[in-house]
């Protein structure tokens, strides 16, 4: 089969969105500047926080977008304030590192309503280890540390609805219930690959009344009658000898949009985390997701098939 060809129909708008990604005021907007310092009355004893959670979030987002270290991000933001003639200071890099362990970074979008199709996948983000070239030439060393980023993406808008970071030894199916519980929006169907073909995942989808589009593994058997979605997939597999027809008829192939989201993460922000503490790494990953959702909202390509 010849490769399909598509034409972008909103190139002018999308091109402006791509250019806007490099704008400093796109990431450091008036809302962040006005709420830079903490104004709320402290609810506990001790020294009050000087900088707001939004300020810490903004620093972490800029750090990821421009691929800076914490020290470089501090100097970068201070220079922006100087050029803007704004009487603000960037939080000290040690303050950001400490606050990142407890800050709650929101990546929720303003989109509301039913989600027709949620697609789910995970990818690895490296914390420690050699680059691919060294591994190719000399082999890998023993110490290689990874974290797993789990994403649930709206297949229509490309917005990340749910996100979580886990240790490398946490399986996709184990992380699934906590991931899907992050949203209370109605979801019509959810797609995931064969790694999620477990009762734990299917039970969570049944609890939320979501149609499960998870391909059963080769030679899979039937489950009790309440797992109707899976049993239909198993029956189709036995009739045709594979899951190919089932994937085509159920629109399962839309799950590739989750892989597109993973590709965007690696291409735009790199495939590694730099903070040393695990809680800080969670904040760094959520800042990454927040930045990606902001880019998505600014503009995405719209295309039509031409061949």
Swiss-Prot record:
Q: Which GO terms describe its biological process?
A: DNA recombination; transposition
Provide this UniProt record's keywords sorted from A to Z. Answer: DNA recombination, DNA-binding, Transposable element, Transposition
Which InterPro entries does this one have? Answer: Tn903_transposase (IPR053172), Tnp_DDE_dom (IPR025668), Transposase_Tn903 (IPR053520)
**The keyword DNA-binding belongs to this UniProt entry's keyword annotation:** yes
Task: Determine the domain of life of the protein's source.
Answer: Bacteria
Q: Name one Pfam family in it.
A: DDE_Tnp_1_5
One of the entry's Gene Ontology molecular-function terms is: DNA binding
Query: What role is this protein assigned?
Result: Required for transposition of transposon Tn903.
Q: Additional info?
A: Transposon Tn903 codes for kanamycin resistance.
State the NCBIfam families in the record.
transpos_IS5_2
The name of this protein is Probable transposase for transposon Tn903
Look up and give the organism this protein is from: Escherichia coli
């Amino acid at each position: 089969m010849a490769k399909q060809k598509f034409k972008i129909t909103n190139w002018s708008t999308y091109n402006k969105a791509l250019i806007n990604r490099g704008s400093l005021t796109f990431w450091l907007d008036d809302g962040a500047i006005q709420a830079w310092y903490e104004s709320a009355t402290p609810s506990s004893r001790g020294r009050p926080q000087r900088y707001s959670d939004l300020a810490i979030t903004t620093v972490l987002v800029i750090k990821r977008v421009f691929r800076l270290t914490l020290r470089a991000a501090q100097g970068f933001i201070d220079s922006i304030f100087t050029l803007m003639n704004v009487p603000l200071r960037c939080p000290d890099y040690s303050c950001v590192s400490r606050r990142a362990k407890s800050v709650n970074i929101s990546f929720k979008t303003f989109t509301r309503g039913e989600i027709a199709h949620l697609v789910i996948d995970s990818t690895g983000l490296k914390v420690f280890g050699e680059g691919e070239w060294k591994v190719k030439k000399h082999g890998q060393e023993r110490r290689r540390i990874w974290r797993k980023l789990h994403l649930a993406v709206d297949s229509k808008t490309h917005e990340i609805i749910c996100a979580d970071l886990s240790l490398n030894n946490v399986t996709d199916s184990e992380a699934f219930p906590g991931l899907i519980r992050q949203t209370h929006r109605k979801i019509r169907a959810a797609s995931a690959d064969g790694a999620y073909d477990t009762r734990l995942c299917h039970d969570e989808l049944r609890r939320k009344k979501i149609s499960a589009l998870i391909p059963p593994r080769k030679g899979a058997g039937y489950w009790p009658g309440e797992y109707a979605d899976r049993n239909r997939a198993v029956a189709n597999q036995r009739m045709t000898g594979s899951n190919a027809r089932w994937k085509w008829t159920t629109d399962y192939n839309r799950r590739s949009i989750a892989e597109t989201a993973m590709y965007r993460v690696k291409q735009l922000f790199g495939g590694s985390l730099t903070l040393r503490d695990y809680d800080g790494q969670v904040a760094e990953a959520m800042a990454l997701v927040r930045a990606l959702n902001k880019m998505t909202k600014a503009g995405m390509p719209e295309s039509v098939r031409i061949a």
